[in-house]
Amino acid sequence: MSSVEIRKVTDKKSLAAFIDFHYDLYKGSPYDAPNLYSDEVHTLSKDKNAAFEFCEAEYFMAYKDGKLVGRIAGIINKRANEKWERKSVRFGWVDFIDDIEVSRALFQAVEDWGRQKGMTEIVGPLGFTDMDPEGMLIEGFEELGTMATIYNYPYYPQHIEQLGGWEKDNDYLEFKLIVPQGGVPEKYQKIAEMVMKRYNLHPMHPKRSQVFGEEQIGRKVLNVVNKSFGHLYGYSQMTEAQIDEYLKMYFPMLDMNLICLIEDWNTPNHDIIGVGISITSMTRALQKCRRGRLWPFGWWHCIRALKFRKAECVDMMLVGILPEYQQKGANALLFYDLIPWYQKYGFKWGETNVEMETNNQVQSQWKYLDHQQHKRRRCSKKVIGDGC
């Protein structure tokens, strides 16, 4: 039996090989939503990703008979560890062929590195921050993936179980929501009208000039995300540098009609207290980008999806309400406002982002829609030492 050789990523060439392995392993998959190569380079580069202000990382590749057969990232998020009082080394960007010796060697590499850094547990899949994809798919392998989540083959969780020592740390659920026809469901409409009248909360759509201009609405939106997501599993607040980074990377591609903000008109400046961001599903377009590249023709597939709205699915990327408003029905305003836009754009169904299985408050907001819980993903953990 051939042995598995572990090599570290040390330069641009080896980083390119690390990134490209996913495209090779998932070539032809009808479910995977591959990331753009340029985005992966940005996220994984220490001189580009603002998360390296408080993170450190090491990337490992597995070779067998001279062939690349797996990859994994080891990440230590110091802010998250301090906040949650844990000594965790995260694993992410994990891919491997169906060979238990390969997966064993990859996880062992991160465990050893984490132990050297004084960590006591390994946990994942997680990224640098909560804005990166997280959780290993354990249900829903024949469902279409989204650009905000990880797709993996069914043998991945089987390897975790076979390797031993791992246990569940957190599960996420995802839902498929059928876009209703013939207007907004009556229940959403009644709640929304009550919320507007009783609490003076109102939906609005920002103009692109407001997002990036003097009003800095984009920054205000991400500040709402920081405050509303702060209690969630593994979350570490975005720094100002990260906010700048996300504004530049993601907001230019968003359709303002699919961004709904909730304002409190009781405040002098109509403060933003809630946000709902959706985007046309990019999965089919990303699958047509050869090895994640926009050139020569990948850009056309992405533009076509974004501008001509050829997809039947809308990805509901983010819903956040400030904690002090979460009991006032403010989330109903988001769907009261966005559902007519979904109908106008011809969307047939929506894909939610990941939701913690214990977050009953979030899951309850789908009860007035025809919905199906169709995916589950898991973060697992394993003790690797006592930190001494």
Model-assigned labels for residue ranges:
Residues 1-31:
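Generic start-of-chain signal for non-secretory N-termini
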Residues 3-4, 150-232:
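Acyltransferase donor/substrate-recognition loop-hinge adjacent to the catalytic core
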Residues 12-14, 36-46, 53-62, 69, ...:
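Catalytic cores of nucleotide-enabled group-transfer and carboxylate-activating enzymes in metabolic
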Residues 15, 68, 78-81, 130-132, ...:
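Flexible loop/turn segments at secondary-structure boundaries
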Residues 22-60, 64, 72-82, 205-208, ...:
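A conserved beta-strand-loop-helix scaffold within acyl/acetyltransferase catalytic domains
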Residues 48, 75-79, 319, 364-367, ...:
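Alpha-helical subdomain
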Residues 82-165, 290-369:
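Acyl-donor binding region in acyl/amide transferases
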